[in-house]
């Protein structure tokens, strides 16, 4: 299948001995830059998807169609494997199945399904979780939705920050029993908590939003953490750069005086200009 090699690369990361940091990607430009810099994996987060596609905060306003289409654009632009934050699967367990099908055909190497109650319930300001039973149903639905067995399905829980460590372990063990390929934890606050969930489970671990004391790669690898997220700085940097450039122009700065712009060489490389010209020479008679 067209995307199988990307999925096998993600599986090799999960089965390997080390812990890697993925590059946060959100469009064709960012994924090509991450690929060129040698990142082994891209992470397409829900928050950056909402910001890049809609300009909205991370409150589950983006639709599955919009998420999958953005993933499809990135898959076309780059061969970098991408792990997609599929949030709650955009509905109930049947919706989760559809979500997996759409993201699989869009070229995702893997995806996460979480047990957060989304969108937020009426009258509830605090983040809530769905029941363990509903979470298990979503994991089973996700697994039944894939047609390519190499597509990586991860069960994600934020219970560590919402309920308790004991609940985190119960949920992780239940999701593991469904046959998912890895466990994704957010809200882990200490080494003791990480060691507890690692001791109680067997699957590869993905860690998001961890404190500074959990950022030692060798230590993480020893706890079966194979992927550790580092946030989404690239889109924040891009937002600031666009703001500063437009502000300078609005205030009268001449375009040639602007600083921090991409060079012609970098722009050409990111847009794959040489490859496009070569294809044009072959099929349109362009001069090389």
Swiss-Prot record:
Catalysis performed (reactions): oxaloacetate + H(+) = pyruvate + CO2
Entries under SUPFAM superfamilies matching the protein: Phosphoenolpyruvate/pyruvate domain (SSF51621)
Keyword Metal-binding included in the entry's annotation: yes
Cofactor: Mg(2+)
TM regions (residue ranges): none
InterPro entries in the cross-refs: ICL/PEPM (IPR039556), Oxaloacetate_deCOase_bac (IPR023687), Pyrv/PenolPyrv_kinase-like_dom (IPR015813), Pyrv_kinase-like_dom_sf (IPR040442)
Listed CDD domains: ICL_PEPM
Residues binding Mg(2+): 85
Signal peptide interval: none
Keyword set, alphabetical order: Decarboxylase, Lyase, Magnesium, Metal-binding
GO terms assigned for molecular function: magnesium ion binding; methylisocitrate lyase activity; oxaloacetate decarboxylase activity
Co-factor note (free text): Binds 1 Mg(2+) ion per subunit.
The EC number(s) this enzyme carries: 4.1.1.112
Example GO biological process: propionate catabolic process, 2-methylcitrate cycle
Protein residues bound to substrate: 47, 156, 232
Assembly description: Homotetramer; dimer of dimers.
Family note: Belongs to the isocitrate lyase/PEP mutase superfamily. Oxaloacetate decarboxylase family.
UniProt function note: Catalyzes the decarboxylation of oxaloacetate into pyruvate. Seems to play a role in maintaining cellular concentrations of bicarbonate and pyruvate.
Protein name: Oxaloacetate decarboxylase
Source species of the chain: Bradyrhizobium diazoefficiens (strain JCM 10833 / BCRC 13528 / IAM 13628 / NBRC 14792 / USDA 110)
Taxonomy of the source species: Bacteria, Pseudomonadati, Pseudomonadota, Alphaproteobacteria, Hyphomicrobiales
